Amino acid sequence: MSKTFSPSEAAFSVFELMKRQPQFVMRYAMLSAGVMAIYMFVMASTGAGDALQRYAVLAQSEQMPTMEQVQSILGPAMPSLFFSFLISAILSAFLTGMALRKTLHDREEGFWGLQAGPIEGRFLLATLAFVAVISVAAFVIGFITSLIATIHMALGSLAILASIGAMIWFGLRLSQFGVMGVVTGKLGLRESFEQTNGKFWRYFGAYLLWLVIVIILGTIVQGLATIGALALGTKIGSGLPANAQEFATVGWAFYVLLYGMVTGVFNLGFLCIGAYAWHQSRGDLPPPKSDL
């Protein structure tokens, strides 16, 4: 049984899925665009989009925004922002459950693969636990870094770099909680730490390679979507509609459909990395052709 996997094969595994299961990938992309549309509609309807637009304008000004200015804009919008992010997290859990069932067990259950089952519930709880653990770790590391900085400025700079590296290492070690939650029936955080043991650089390389592709292609597609929306009479601007009336245009519909579907494929690619690594590490797939 192979105990390792190829980072490059894992990074490009979504293309293999697209070749074998094009209908599933298309459904996932369309549902992702739908989730983006719902998220943007909630942001626009609750006033959160307008607040973020005003904050973006403030942040781009020549002078550094004061804490009072930031609070005056974002403070009243915090309930709306929290509600919008909560809706997005819940809907994303459904999409993730759909993708993990398919990539790990080749199963599609429910409407278009969507199901409100234990996988979705565990993933949502695990996501909250992941955010909590990362937040605590960031606070502890930040506190230690600040103490070191008070001793010597040069040591403080090195400590900042070390803390960034530590957070990347820790976050990546826990990043497979979705995959491990499905295969073990648990939250998957501890199991993720075990799964990534000795494979950090392989996971890092796979995610970094796919991230570079996402940045390049995402920039191109977003530009095309923005130009297309502008041709239809809609100026996208910051990427968020200020209100529901502004969102209810053909231009925004075109932007969300194109960019949302492509973003869905990008997100599916990140999930495929974990699933592919799991299968290849177990020997379910042919062993890596190379170490790269």
Model-predicted segments: where are they?
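Short, charge-rich, low-complexity alpha-helical interaction segments
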Residues: 127-158
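Helix-boundary and loop/linker segments of multi-pass membrane transporters
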Residues: 16-19, 69-75, 113-117, 149, ...
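Extracellular/periplasmic helix-loop-helix junctions in multi-pass membrane proteins
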Residues: 149-153, 219-261
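Membrane-helix interface motif
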Residues: 41-60, 139-147, 220-237
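Interfacial aromatic "cap" segments that immediately flank transmembrane helices
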Residues: 2-38, 113-136, 169-217, 268-271, ...
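Short, charged juxtamembrane terminal tails flanking transmembrane helices
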Residues: 1-2, 284-292
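Perimembrane loop-to-helix junctions flanking transmembrane segments
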Residues: 51-73, 236-245
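Selective recognition of hydrophobic, aromatic-rich stretches within alpha-helical transmembrane segments
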Residues: 41, 75-107, 149-186, 248-285
